[in-house]
Amino acid sequence: MARYRCLVLDHDDTVVRSAETVNYPAFVENIMQTHPDRLISLAEFNRQCFEQSYTGMCRNALHLTEDEINDGFEFWKVYVRTHIPPAYDGFDRILRRFRAGGGLICVSSHSSVENITRDYERNFGFQPDAMYAWELGEALRKPDPYALHDIMRRFSLRPEELLMVDDMKNGYDMARACGVPFACAGWSHSDPVIIDFMRKNSDFYFESVSAFEDFLFG
């Protein structure tokens, strides 16, 4: 039996390997068409998204307008329809085992419902019990704790019955805001600044998917 009744999973670079395979390449293609002088490296892209989210990076580091941010998201939606990120090895087994034991699987992500739905169907053959995605709007997306509060309300759960799993600080901030345990998806990390922060602040830090699996069912 698993330690928790509900997993609340980030999507990009937690369940699927997306930054290097989809999100950054889409960003490069779009920014080279609009502001080639503002191109940043993959490492800087990841650091900026960690520190202030994708939208914050676009506003504060790249100085894009709101229209340009929205256009960039639409560009990404088209790009990702034909560029599908692979799931991390082992996640299929973890999620199937968790569901078989009666566990709930929810997603809180800055990705879109369309892509989360497709990725779960293709990689795992089922849909999450609840999804909280880009379409919520900025006011209710991570790091706002709306998703966790709504999950607890809908499924009559206490904070300690959930586990938030994310590679980014906004998931950590959301979990902390409502007392939900937080596990860091360290298997996607290579930046020492990100690793140091998440090791120091997360309830649990896992360097590999297999270590997360051992903890969850241990």
For every predicted segment, state its role.
Residues 1-5, 113, 117-218:
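Asp-based, Mg2+/Mn2+-dependent phosphohydrolase catalytic module
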Residues 43, 82-83, 105, 136-137, ...:
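A generic structural signal for short
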Residues 2-89, 93, 100:
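N-terminal helical cap/lid subdomain that shapes the substrate entry/recognition surface
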Residues 73, 91-121, 131-132:
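Substrate-recognition element of Asp-dependent hydrolases with the DxDx(T/V) motif
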Residues 30, 57-60, 97, 119-120, ...:
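Residues within well-ordered alpha helices
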